Amino acid sequence: MVDQNPKRSGEPPVWLMFGAGGTVSAIFLPVVILIIGLLLPFGLVNVHNLITFAYSWIGKLVILVLTIFPMWCGLHRIHHGMHDLKVHVPAGGFIFYGLATIYTVWVLFAVINL
């Protein structure tokens, strides 16, 4: 018989942030590394243009996406990796996702005040 009132999990929002972080890390961070690690030092990208972009609203949005989502992905991987290794942290989900939330709020305030 099918349960008419199944217990709902709090995992879907966390998995959304985890999936977004993995996607951002895989697709966009190599481009950031290319720009900051190679093009900028060789003078192929103007620093003034990067700073101007960072102060625009779209630049702030890019900074938020490139910093918040990968952190959620990383902390989610650490949380589940420790569980897979049989290292059970008391209230591990609360600790790791709480750290990710604190980091998110901190980055939001930092970027808004940029």
From Swiss-Prot:
Q: Which UniProt keywords apply?
A: Cell inner membrane, Cell membrane, Membrane, Transmembrane, Transmembrane helix
Q: Which residues form a coiled coil?
A: none
Residue spans crossing the bilayer: 24-44, 50-70, 92-112
The protein's location, in the record's own words, is: Cell inner membrane
Q: Which GO terms describe its cellular component?
A: fumarate reductase complex; plasma membrane
Q: What Gene3D superfamilies does its record include? A: Fumarate reductase/succinate dehydrogenase, transmembrane subunit
GO process annotations (BP): fumarate metabolic process
List the InterPro entries. Answer: Fumarate_red_D (IPR003418), SQR/QFR_C/D (IPR034804)
Molecular-function annotations in GO: succinate dehydrogenase activity
- The family this protein is said to belong to: Belongs to the FrdD family.
Q: State the oligomer form and interacting partners.
A: Part of an enzyme complex containing four subunits: a flavoprotein (FrdA), an iron-sulfur protein (FrdB), and two hydrophobic anchor proteins (FrdC and FrdD).
Described by its record, this protein's role is as follows: Anchors the catalytic components of the fumarate reductase complex to the cell membrane, binds quinones.
The protein here is known as Fumarate reductase subunit D
Q: Which organism is it from?
A: Haemophilus influenzae (strain PittGG)
Tell me the gene name. frdD
